[in-house]
Amino acid sequence: MGEGHKKLNFSDCMGLAIGQIIGSGIMVLTGIVIGLTGHGIAAAFILGAVLAVITCVPFIILTSAIPSSGAGFTYIRRLMGEKAGFMYIAMFVLSQVLIATYAKGFASYFCSIFPQFGESAVAMAALVICTAINLIGLKSSALVQKGMVVLLLLSLFLFIVFGLPKVSWDALTPTVSNLMPNGPKNFFTGVALLSFACGGAKFVAENGDDIVEPSRTIPKVIVLSTSIVAVFYVLIGIVAGGVLPVETVAFQNLTLVAQEIFPTWLYLFFVFGGAVFALLTTLNGTLSWVTRGLQAAAKQGWLPEKTAEENRNGVPAILLMVFFLMGAIPILTGMDLTLISNMGVGTDMVTEFMVLLACWRLPDIFPEEYQKSAFCMKKRTLHILLFFIGILIIGTSYVNLSDLTVPAAIACGIYILVMFVYTQVRYPYVKAKQEKKEDK
C-alpha cells in the first residue's frame, strides 16, 4: 500500500481480524474436539482463546517496536538471521498439511448429502480443482470471499439460535468427569487445536506498515477481536456438544446436530451455504496466497531461481505444486482429520516459538525502537515473561505432536533434519548472492 492510499484504522483492523479468525476451520475442528473433550468443549474454547492471545504476546511486542509487513518471516530474518528465516518458512510449509483439512472437511459435508461418493475421492477432486483454478489465475474475488464470510456467519448464528433452546443443560454440569472425560492430555490437545481456530488476528500484523499507529492499534485489535469471536465460538460449542449425546457427535462434523435442530430447508442451507461453500472458498483462497513466503525465499536464493518464476497468469506454478502435495499426501495416505490437525497445529506452534526467540533478542538488536515501544519493560521482565510463554508454547506443541502416529512422526523428523542440513549447505550461496546484489 503506497503513501497515497488511506491507512487502516482501528475499525478497519477489527473487521480484518474478525474475518481472519472466523473461518471454516470451526466447521472441521468442533467435532474433533468434542471427541477429545466431551462436554468440556465450551471450557476448551475459552482456554483456546486465552492461549491464542498469550501466544500472540511476542508478536504484539515485536509489532509495537518494529511494525513491519511480512511480520513473522521478517522478524525472524532481522533478529535471528537468514538461516533461521528459511527454517521458519520450512516449518510453515510443513504446517500446511492443514490444507488437507479444508479438502477433507469439504468432502465430509458434501458426502453427508451425497453419500454415494467416496470422501477421499471428493477431497482430492476439490484439491485438484482449486489448484487448477489458481494455476490459471482465477483467484476468488474479494466479493466472493466477503460473501463466504457472511454466509458462514449467518449459518453459525442460526446454529446458535436454533440450537440453544434444545441443549440438555443438565448434561453440561461443570464437573471434572464432564470437562475431562478422556483425561487431561486429550483435553489440552483439544485446547491446543481450538487455539488455532481462535487464532488469526495476529495476521493483522502482516499489514504493519499500512496501519495507523500500529504499535497501539495491533495489540488492541488482537486481544479484542479474539475475545469477541471466543464468545461466539463458546455458544457454538455448547450447541454442538449439548443437543445430542457426546458419543453420537464425537469426531463427527456438525451435520448431525444441524439435522436435529433445523427444518430441512435450513439444514440444506447450513450444509451448502455455510459449510460446503465456506470450506471450498477457504481452500481456494489459501492456495492463492500460501506461496508468497516461499517465493520470497526462492528469490533470495534459498531455492533454484526457476522455482520463483511465475507462469503467464502470474502464478509461481512450481511452488503452488509444493503446497498441492502438502494437501494431497495426507488425503492419499488416509490420514484422518485429527492426525492432520495435530501435525499442522503442532508444527505451527514451532513457528510461534521461533517468533518468541526473535522477540527475546529484540532489546539487544533494536534497543532504541524497543525503548520507544508501547510495551517496553525491563529486559529481565521481558525474558521472564517470554520464558513462561515459551513453556506454554512448547507444551502445546508437545500435546499435539505426541499424538502423531509413528510413520507421521518419523516423516516430520526426517523433513526437519533434511531442511536443517539443506539450510547449512545452501547458506553460502545465499550470502554470496546478497553480497553481489549489494555491490551493484
What are these regions (language model features)?
Residues 1-31, 36-40, 52-53, 57, ...:
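Membrane-interface "cap" regions at the ends of multi-pass membrane proteins
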Residues 74-76, 81, 112, 223-284, ...:
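TM-loop-TM module centered on a large, flexible mid-protein loop between adjacent transmembrane helices
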Residues 144, 306-317, 352-406, 429-440:
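C-terminal membrane-solvent junction of multi-pass transporters and transport-like membrane proteins
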Residues 6-17, 81-94, 125-126, 181-194, ...:
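Select transmembrane alpha-helical segments in multipass membrane proteins
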